[in-house]
């Protein structure tokens, strides 16, 4: 039985071979489904998630209301940067997880940069 590997999965593997997060400079990884956006800061050395924010999280659920997906992605980026600053994280390595740097992925990255994270 042949194993089907999508183009995004190939891109994701190629990116992950090149980048890795540490405690001082964790990896900001993004996942998007058709409805929701997920972003987290990962320390690959220890294998731990340091900060996690999603459109499904309780802290954002009330704020989002009836906004479109791109606006919700911006709020995820802002909330992630705020939580990272609270933990003393200033710099990150950006992992787009094989998704095109466009639309919601770009919105999360731009909002995180505006809120003070350095890529």
UniProtKB/Swiss-Prot annotation:
Alphabetical keyword list: Ribonucleoprotein, Ribosomal protein, RNA-binding, rRNA-binding
InterPro entries tied to this protein: Ribosomal_uL18_bac-type (IPR004389), Ribosomal_uL18_bac/euk (IPR005484)
Cysteine pairings via disulfide bonds: none
Biological process terms in GO annotation: translation
UniProt family annotation: Belongs to the universal ribosomal protein uL18 family.
PANTHER family per UniProt: 39S RIBOSOMAL PROTEIN L18, MITOCHONDRIAL, LARGE RIBOSOMAL SUBUNIT PROTEIN UL18M
Function: This is one of the proteins that bind and probably mediate the attachment of the 5S RNA into the large ribosomal subunit, where it forms part of the central protuberance.
Summary of subunit composition and partner proteins: Part of the 50S ribosomal subunit; part of the 5S rRNA/L5/L18/L25 subcomplex. Contacts the 5S and 23S rRNAs.
Protein name as it appears in the record: Large ribosomal subunit protein uL18
Organism annotation: Anaeromyxobacter sp. (strain K)
């Amino acid at each position: 039985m042949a194993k089907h590997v999508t183009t995004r999965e190939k891109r994701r593997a190629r990116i992950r071979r090149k980048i890795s997060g540490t405690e001082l400079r964790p990896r900001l990884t993004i996942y998007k489904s058709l409805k929701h956006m997920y972003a987290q800061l990962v320390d690959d050395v220890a294998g731990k998630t340091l900060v996690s924010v999603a459109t499904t999280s309780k802290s954002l659920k009330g704020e989002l209301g009836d906004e479109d997906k791109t606006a919700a992605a911006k709020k995820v980026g802002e909330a992630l940067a705020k939580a990272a600053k609270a933990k003393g994280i200033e710099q990150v390595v950006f992992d787009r997880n094989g998704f095109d740097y466009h639309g919601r992925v770009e919105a999360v990255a731009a909002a995180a940069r505006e809120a003070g994270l350095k890529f």
